[in-house]
Amino acid sequence: TSSAGPPIDEKPYWTVSSTGQTCYQAIRNLSTQSPRIIFWGHNRLTLLGENMAKSGVSEVLDLLQRNHEVRSSMDVMSVRNASIDEVMATMFELERQPVKGFFGLLWSIQRRNSTSFPQSVLELSRKIETEGMEPVIPSVEVVNRSDEETAAPGQLREEVVMDSVRINGMAAFKEDKLVGWLADRESRGVLWVLGKAQRGILVIRDPRDDNNLISIRIGASSSKIVPEIVDDRPVIRVVVEAEGDPLEIDGDASFLHHPEIWASMERRMAAVIRNEIQMALTAGQQQFQSDIFGFGRAFYSKYPHEWQLIKDNWDNIFPTLEVQLDIIANLKEPGLTVEGVRQAQ
């Protein structure tokens, strides 16, 4: 006898697409291909195609929020350099269902690298509608993997490696339109400003020898955006406090209890954070001209009257806005683990 059920290599999901003159029509046209009624309450993730994101996402967001079945907490991502079909055709090595793979990536990136963070449909919609603030959402791209041939003793074996996906930085918007892509370090620079950088690794050079590298594990961090008016012009001061602890050290580690070297490491850590924020500022102010940091919103909160005078001209003010950075880095004591393995030998 044989047990009923699908073959072990059969996909546990079905990919289907439809078209229409409007989003609602395209959704209704799905009924011509699906024998079952689609329940949108099960939807956990929305992927935005690059071309559609560049033309504007308001119609899609409006559709999602008007549908009483759709969860406003559903995550949203933007696809880069690929079509939705190409993304849906990829495989996750350790997950049979793509949606579990996407959520695994989001969890890992947020808690391990701080180069991206989840955004829901509701959060994206609110940032689009909020004055003085532009949204950023995770960026997804396809990782191309060529077919491989591997030889085993006495035989030839062909191994087909499917394409996969990865979260690579973030997508920057201006109003409801995609305007560009942030690389990993630029994305973390945005997260430093927003106070969302909680995990990841910073690499600094050893104060004793620039040829040696030290890995710093990012701990807790916080930020404060302080708007000021100096000589009748707006100025932003960003204060970032970050904790870290040395995780990997090239060479002798006995210097960790030397106060002057410890202070030098903290200065170098602060310099790396400053550099990442500067990279993000350059992208936001010069490349995209999009206030992805919410500086305008900070001015509105502190100076509501003055904001009414400058808000219509904010798009011209923001690219040349002076931003002052105050970075405070604190390294935790290494505890009992001081001597490295090589030194102990």
Where in this protein do the model-derived segments appear?
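Membrane-proximal alpha-helical signals and transmembrane carboxylates
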Residues: 1-345
